[in-house]
């Protein structure tokens, strides 16, 4: 009877947390899962280069392969990430172990799970991967490059440079806009692949962030298109806009209505900035 009572109390507590705070519920589930998760299998030793795709992702399960109740899948569902990308995102319960497998002795702090976002080049070859924290671990994003000569650009394997190209800051934001890549927090050099007026930059909505404002001015100076968020925008980024209930079509309409270039972009940016 005591065991049944404890199980009943746990169910009530789970339901309460889920009802009051869905985000906290996802983090709470993840914490419970971590305690009961089996240890990561020992890596197989062979003589092939450590950079090969299979040694990095082969031991990981994609989000698509996880049970619907798995905390990592619940997190992705909660962020409203389109299901077409579930097989392109992975769960890693020991991120530090994964990093040290390809770059020994890089990660020495306390290990924890992360969402793995792989970066592929235009030929489909893996050249980097990003770990996104589920909880409050810092930094929130950690990107590991396997090829130091390549820029940290996400989404190159599916972008069409003959069409209008959108560029966001974060990889997750790029999943909600067609033909979109992410600069992953770095200044992107497009190497003349595409006319400047065929490129639209979308930064996070942070008018008080000096670094972002500086980069926005740089985009305008290079004659790229720039999205300048309206004054009544209360969401921080594209993912927040989608989570609020906005559809992809409505998002595209919002972006198009707030896209500027040259003098009009400069005028709007001067009004937008709060620094």
Ranges and model annotations:
Residues 18-115, 123, 257-275:
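TOPRIM metal-binding catalytic domain and adjacent DNA-binding surface shared by DnaG-type primases
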């Amino acid at each position: 009877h005591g065991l049944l009572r404890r199980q009943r109390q746990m169910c009530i507590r789970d339901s309460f947390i889920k009802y009051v705070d869905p985000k906290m519920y996802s983090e709470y589930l993840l914490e419970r899962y971590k305690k009961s998760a089996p240890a990561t299998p020992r890596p197989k030793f062979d003589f092939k280069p450590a950079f090969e795709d299979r040694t990095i992702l082969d031991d990981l399960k994609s989000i698509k392969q996880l049970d619907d109740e798995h905390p990592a899948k619940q997190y992705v569902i909660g962020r409203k990430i389109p299901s077409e990308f579930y097989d392109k995102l992975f769960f890693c319960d020991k991120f530090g172990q994964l990093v040290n497998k390809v770059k020994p002795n890089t990660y020495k702090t306390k290990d924890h799970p992360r969402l793995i976002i792989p970066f592929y080049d235009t030929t489909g070859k893996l050249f980097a991967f990003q770990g996104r924290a589920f909880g409050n671990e810092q930094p929130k994003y950690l990107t590991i490059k396997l090829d130091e000569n390549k820029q940290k650009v996400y989404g190159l394997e599916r972008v069409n440079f003959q069409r209008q190209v959108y560029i966001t800051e974060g990889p997750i934001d790029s999943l909600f806009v067609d033909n979109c890549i992410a600069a992953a927090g770095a200044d992107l050099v497009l190497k003349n692949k595409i006319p400047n007026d065929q490129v639209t930059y979308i930064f996070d909505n942070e008018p008080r962030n000096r670094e972002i404002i500086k980069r926005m001015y740089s985009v305008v100076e290079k004659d790229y298109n720039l999205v300048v968020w309206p004054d009544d925008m209360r969401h921080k980024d594209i993912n927040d806009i989608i989570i609020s209930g906005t559809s992809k079509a409505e998002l595209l309409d919002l972006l198009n209505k707030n896209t500027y270039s040259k003098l009009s972009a400069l005028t709007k940016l001067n009004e937008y900035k709060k620094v």
